[in-house]
Amino acid sequence: MWDSSYMQQVSEGLMTGKVPIDQVFGANPLEKLYKRRKPKGTVGLQCSPCLMSKATSTDDIIWDQLIVKKTLADLLIPINRQISDIQSTLSEVTTRVHEIERQLHEITPVLKMGRTLEAISKGMSEMLAKYDHLVISTGRTTAPAAAFDAYLNEHGVPPPQPAIFKDLGVAQQACSKGTMVKNATTDAADKMSKVLELSEETFSKPNLSAKDLALLLFTHLPGNNTPFHILAQVLSKIAYKSGKSGAFLDAFHQILSEGENAQAALTRLSRTFDAFLGVVPPVIRVKNFQTVPRPCQKSLRAVPPNPTIDKGWVCVYSSEQGETRALKI
């Protein structure tokens, strides 16, 4: 039987901690419970061997991937370098291609010129071949003119083959008296006589037409339809009518060589050249003075009693209303 007072003392001792539990029970009844519990934060979680093997294989895969990435990066570096070299080479090739295209555009006129020269060479070859045939077909080369004249006197027409002295024979036949000459032969003789009259003097100072002479003077004048253009036309026409167009052009060039401009040369010639002294300026019919070239309208003056070109009066404009104005330089 348990003593109640003893049990009360034991209870109080246990409650107050004065009596150890081992002393009462001989062993701690919660010892097994303490052993089964795991202290917090002192020992890590323990994985099973299966999980540990799986973790190890994952680490290997990640490591392999890192190795593969590094290998690919090492391979891509030279590839990028080669691509950059290829791009630079392509840019250089493109530049050279554009340069070649530009040179081809420059060579194109040369090629066309080459074709033209080839055609000229071919034409010259044909002309040389015809010339060789020309000498052979005229009979004896020592007297081709006599042979031509004999054939012409006998038949009345030139021989069908080409002849070296054809022009000379035609001229002699046309100039001979008492001979019936056909129209074609007469025309050829007239043309030949004009050519035979060409001498050193006429060649150096040709009698130019008024239009050609005015165009030559225009090349030295600035602007268009100025009073000096009208003066050049008037002087050219007067010089052509007097047969001194060549001398007038020589005098014009002589003044230019002295350092004067074209306007000063025309003004000086209009006052000193003998063909223009005392010549009355021509009269030009116009509808009204508004049709006169605009650069000349400011130079229109009232017509004096006796206008002459050597006094600076170029021409006289006459309108349909009967009014007159003179162009003064």
Curated annotation (Swiss-Prot):
Residues 70-120 form a coiled coil. PROSITE patterns: VP35_IID. The keyword Coiled coil applies. Signal peptide: none annotated. It is found in: Virion; Host cytoplasm. Keywords: Coiled coil, Host cytoplasm, Transcription, Viral RNA replication, Virion. Residues 204-329 form the VP35 IID domain. Changing P49L: In strain: Isolate Sanchez. Its main location: virion. One of its GO terms (cellular component) is virion component. It comes from the Viruses. Belongs to the filoviridae polymerase cofactor VP35 family. Homooligomer. Homomultimerization via the coiled coil domain is a prerequisite for binding to L. Found in a trimeric complex in which VP35 bridges L and the nucleoprotein. Interacts with NP. Disrupts innate immune signaling in infected host cell. Plays an essential role in viral RNA synthesis and also a role in suppressing innate immune signaling. This is Polymerase cofactor VP35.
